């Protein structure tokens, strides 16, 4: 892991550093405004954290990235094997439709530039995939259920 920010709030993967057309990172708990159980850099809106703190943390994350993404796409993960392809259908959906599309999703896949696909992990494994020929990225949340159900093989 390499630090992408001076305050070490974002870490990167050396193995993916040679691909300048993608940004790949892990956030830490440091550098945000959330308090209590969510202290301090919580960017996930599904935790019960204060909505304004989550918004500020997400804005700080977007500002810290090499290219400002038009959207952080954060699914409501349920330790399933369900995935969502972020494509024109998602892009043209209403906010309410997007929220519904992201329910129960544990893997995001896209070839659309400008979107930041996100997964949340604690004791689970983040699997980040990149197909440089087709310029497709995937972010897979692999908990024990996903591992048992071969979630990573489904998406490779």
PLM-predicted stretches and their roles:
Residues 1-154:
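Active-site microenvironment for binding and transforming phosphate-containing groups
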């Amino acid at each position: 892991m390499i630090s992408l920010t001076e305050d070490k709030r974002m870490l990167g993967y050396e193995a993916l550093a040679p691909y300048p057309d993608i940004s790949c990172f892990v956030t830490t708990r440091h550098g945000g405004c959330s308090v209590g159980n969510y202290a301090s850099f919580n960017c996930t809106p599904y935790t019960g954290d204060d909505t304004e703190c989550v918004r500020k943390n997400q804005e700080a994350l977007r500002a810290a990235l090499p290219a400002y993404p038009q959207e952080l796409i954060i699914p409501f993960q349920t330790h399933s094997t369900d995935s969502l392809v972020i494509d024109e259908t998602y892009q043209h959906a209403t906010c309410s439709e997007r929220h519904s599309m992201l329910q129960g999703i544990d893997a995001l896949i896209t070839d659309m530039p400008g979107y930041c696909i996100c997964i949340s992990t604690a004791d689970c494994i983040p699997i980040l995939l990149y197909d440089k020929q087709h310029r497709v990225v995937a972010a897979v949340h692999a908990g024990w259920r996903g591992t048992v159900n071969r979630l990573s093989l489904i998406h490779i």
